[in-house]
């Protein structure tokens, strides 16, 4: 496709921005039905886009980008299993991980739905055995603790989801997650473990990932010291496709759960990578989790673009980053259970769309890839909201909240959850409408303080509400952002499904390891790195 910035649709949007940029949300909200017009439903989510900087003309011109970029055709191609990942010649089929068993999808001659449900069936049997006490450790003890060892998509997804759905952990099994090659990560987990009731899940597609295998070998040594070599087979399982390496490690390949090249790591929480999650919340709720994904997939696939929530949110991201110059995007869940959601989205969005060349290798001419970050409310209000409210940088933000908490406590005449949500609604209101100098002066504020207290408003937010944080709703939330990523990648004409920027650092680390450990002389090829390694060796 042509560079999107050279199209008439992009030029029309550029001209529109010149005329629209001074428009305020106060002005836009003079339209009586604005909130109703820009509120949508998708897979159990209630999504209010009305506090964004757009009007009908903006939306029409943003939607024109989808025509220019061939978005409809690319969506259909993704769901059909065409090789959208052109640099690795792979299908992009994370949506197949949540297809119903009766679905009909074959790719490259393989019945994908049948393959997915065969693995799900094995996962279900294994999780059921753990939860019922039929799977026992080497000494006959039931498993009470699972330690998931992985990194990137093999850690961030299941760790986030397990915390988010902790209210559904009803079988007495809990999970810890180890990812960092910093030994403090594993050591801090092992300190509190009972080897006899612990199961390690080693998640690595190739079973060669440096950080994961380093942690797995250290965990294996710890277990062997406690229980002996023969215990390994009853206390380790693998999420991998490399049967040879798994067997060499001492894991019975009958306890190896695979996934496929068409699943990227950051899109894999609903694959076998979610084994730890399934063991903690149970197969029934895991299937509800998948159902939420599928509901959002169907909304994305079938809903007309002007009412399609992932598409609209993706277009707003392009609007802010490429026209308003916003560089970051805050995700602010007013839910402690979603405290790891922003970290999860960082990999999903930034590893996907942090690209500087088009699919054909030519340089991009627009901005790409928003920087995602965030913390749960109300903590963020007492940390970084000051900058969002009164700073010089535009930070579009997504607020995520729920009508009903899993637990609640009294707070005077109200409840703590009502207090939480009062803050939630207040923040989006103040960010949108602020308070001007005239209004502040009318309150009797000293003249020299008026400008300090002005709240400019006009800070765009999207509000996402659901009745309750359930497995289904979490699945829908994740799929929402997955599809936002895909749409933006299509608009920018980049490959959202590779990650070559991760590889060179891995290679360099392997090359430097002998010098860092003292096995070889220091000669990295640049004086800075050489001097830093020499300092490290002299002071360790």
Curated annotation (Swiss-Prot):
It comes from the Bacteria. GO terms for molecular function: carbohydrate derivative binding; glucose-6-phosphate isomerase activity; monosaccharide binding. The active site is at 351 (proton donor), 382, 506. It is found in: Cytoplasm. It is an enzyme of class 5 (isomerase). SUPFAM superfamilies: SIS domain. This is Glucose-6-phosphate isomerase. It comes from Corynebacterium glutamicum (strain R).
